[in-house]
A protein has these predicted regions:
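N-terminal single-pass transmembrane signal-anchor helix
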Residues: 1-23, 30
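Contiguous, often N-terminal, cationic amphipathic patches that form binding interfaces
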Residues: 2, 8, 42, 46, ...
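Membrane-proximal N-terminal amphipathic helix
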Residues: 24-54, 59-64, 69
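Intrinsically disordered, low-complexity regions enriched in Pro/Ser/Thr/Gly and acidic residues
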Residues: 62-232
Length: 232
């Protein structure tokens, strides 16, 4: 009986850790899948329509431009529901930043975003930054030719509904899809928008999760791309 009791205590102690580890691996897999989906759609849309500055993006924050761009990409994705600029796709739930503060912004009701839901439940919203694809967001040719951005919820309305945990972002560049927080990005860098969960909003976490395959920024605040990509 004593042995069984010890086993039960050990199981109770280790089970939460195992569940958390499984959920983290699931998050990594889902986010990498979204990255692949967007990247493949970009390549196929580029082949059919040319680079994004030729997709009739019209102007900054243009509802028509966002719909023109996302509808072209949607041709090459497994879409369950396409909302365009109308509400009904991007779940209007209470999101929070990585630091726990409330995210007071409704994408679902914002017509400058075009929205869709993939067959696997992923929600994607897109808006236009520069119709000529020349917005500067970093120190590379790709990041100096930004056309628009994507906001992604990898599990729809399910919790935690938090930036950096199930809500992430990507960039549409003239030259491809870039995850927010990429090493050369300056607008939403990992160092200033993800590294410290107590103060940062979490918009710079996407690239870290994809390339380092962890959410260790939830457990320590001294990570960096070159010398420490895991807490332990």
């Amino acid at each position: 009986m004593i042995t069984l009791g010890i086993i039960g205590v050990v199981a109770a102690m280790t089970m939460p850790s195992l569940i958390a580890n499984h959920k983290e691996k699931e998050t990594v897999a889902k986010l990498k899948k979204v990255y692949s989906t967007l990247s493949n759609a970009y390549l196929l849309a580029k082949e059919k329509y040319g680079t994004p500055e030729n997709w009739e993006l019209t102007e900054y924050d243009s509802p028509e431009g966002a719909d023109n761009a996302l509808s072209k990409l949607a041709e090459f994705m497994n879409v369950a529901k396409y909302c365009g600029n109308a509400p009904g796709c991007y779940t209007d739930v209470d999101y929070r930043y990585l630091n726990g503060q409330k995210y007071n912004y409704s994408i679902d009701n914002n017509t400058s975003y075009a929205k869709l839901i993939l067959a696997d439940g992923t929600i994607i919203a897109m808006n236009i930054r520069e119709p000529d694809c020349k917005q500067d967001r970093g120190d590379s040719v790709v990041l100096k030719n930004v056309c628009g951005t994507f906001s992604v919820d990898i599990n729809g309305p399910k919790p935690p509904n938090q930036v950096g945990r199930d809500r992430y972002g990507f960039i549409l560049s003239k030259y491809g899809i870039i995850p927010h927080g990429a090493q050369l990005e300056t607008m939403f860098s990992f160092e200033t928008n993800c590294k410290d969960k107590s103060t940062h909003q979490g918009f710079g976490c996407t690239a870290w999760v994809i390339f380092n395959e962890n959410l260790d920024y939830m457990r320590c605040n001294d990570l960096d791309w070159e010398n420490k990509t895991k807490c332990k």
